[in-house]
Regions:
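Extended, non-catalytic subsegments within catalytic or DNA/protein-binding/adaptor domains
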Residues: 3-350
Length: 350
């Protein structure tokens, strides 16, 4: 919307609440709103809007939308002023994690950016206030617990003892996610068309990912395993039992054990892992998520001497620091200066 028109509309609503204008229509539910070029061909405008919306990842958009809704629920208005934000983050500091508040500010910043309005989040006052909140209320980032080979084996063994469609699906999902080090968004997007079975194993095309937003694509290879642990056979058995010939491979199953056409959603993957871990008797269910498989792969692969670059390539990580963090956490006792000192400086004494 051109500045002159926006200014005119603001003047019309000046006796009410001019800042409510932006959140009365489509932008209330969509964090990314753009001006679509006027065109006599409505299909062109619609297509343009579609492409513009794809400039932001779906997960990011949903996260920002949720943040905007929370800001509104607390009485916040858009466009926001510096004072609005000061009041908001000061009031929420005792109850929200500082990282959550920082994310809310990022969402609000993006909203103003896309509306071509001044960004109120970038003032010195806001930055200093947020820094003070982090210093006062900062907490260690909660991390998903890594699942190791012994956990995977126990989960797979349990599933193989069940005789139903869900167990076959979950077995394929757990093994593929673990040995492929897939993100859950990648996992639920896999289709039959992305799979290619070879004599050495299974090739899985990942057409787009968190670190490949422009869709260059990446292929992951999963080798055959043994009779109990084999991601390739697990996927084959699932596809045959579910008679899936095309489309998404990981789909919802209703309470009558009937396969549904739609794929699993992101929350379903976490629920499957937690439910299975609970049935296996794990005492750390609350610390698990889909990321436990991906983190566990990196940690466990490093523990058996796998080359760093191999681990990084399989997981599709671009940031070396992230992979090293996973690996180092899994080797806290193995590569431990205190352990070395105790062993050689004290245990050798008679």
């Amino acid at each position: 919307m051109p500045y002159q028109i926006r200014k005119f509309i603001f003047s019309i609503f000046s006796l009410q609440n001019p800042r409510s204008l932006y959140m009365n229509a489509e932008s209330k539910n969509n964090i990314v709103i753009f001006d679509v070029a006027t065109s006599n061909d409505k299909s062109i405008a619609k297509t343009q809007q579609f492409y513009l919306s794809k400039a932001t990842a779906d997960n990011t958009r949903r996260t920002y939308q949720a943040a905007i809704r929370q800001f509104e629920a607390a009485g916040g208005l858009l466009p926001a002023t510096e004072q609005d934000l000061i009041l908001y983050i000061t009031a929420k500091a005792p109850v929200l994690n500082p990282r959550t508040l920082s994310l809310h500010l990022t969402a609000i910043s993006h909203w103003h950016c896309y509306q071509q309005l001044p960004d109120p989040t970038q003032t010195i006052q806001i930055r200093k206030l947020l820094k003070g909140i982090f210093r006062s209320h900062g907490k260690p980032k909660r991390k998903a617990k890594a699942l190791h080979p012994e956990h995977i084996e126990k989960m797979v063994t349990y599933l193989q003892q069940q005789n139903n469609l869900k167990a076959l699906r979950d077995n394929a999902l757990i093994q593929l996610a673990y040995f492929g080090a897939f993100r859950r968004s990648e996992l639920i997007a896999i289709t039959v068309e992305h799979l290619r079975f070879e004599t050495q194993g299974l090739l899985v095309l990942v057409p787009m990912s968190k670190t490949d937003q422009e869709g260059e694509g990446k292929t992951k290879a999963l080798p055959y395993g043994n009779n109990n642990i084999c991601p390739v056979q697990a996927v084959k058995l699932w596809l045959e039992a579910a008679n899936i010939k095309q489309g998404f491979i990981f789909r919802a199953i209703n309470r009558w054990n009937n396969l549904q056409p739609e794929p699993l959603n992101l929350n379903s993957v976490n629920k499957i892992i937690k439910t299975l871990a609970n049935k296996c008797g794990f005492d750390f269910v609350a610390d698990l998520s889909s990321h436990s498989l991906r983190r566990g792969f990196a940690t466990s692969a490093a523990n058996v001497g796998t080359d760093f670059e191999w681990i990084k390539r399989q997981g599709g990580w671009k940031n070396d620091a992230t992979v090293r963090e996973y690996i180092e956490e899994g080797q806290l006792f193995d590569k431990n200066a205190a352990a070395k000192l105790i062993t050689f400086a004290f245990n050798n004494k008679e």
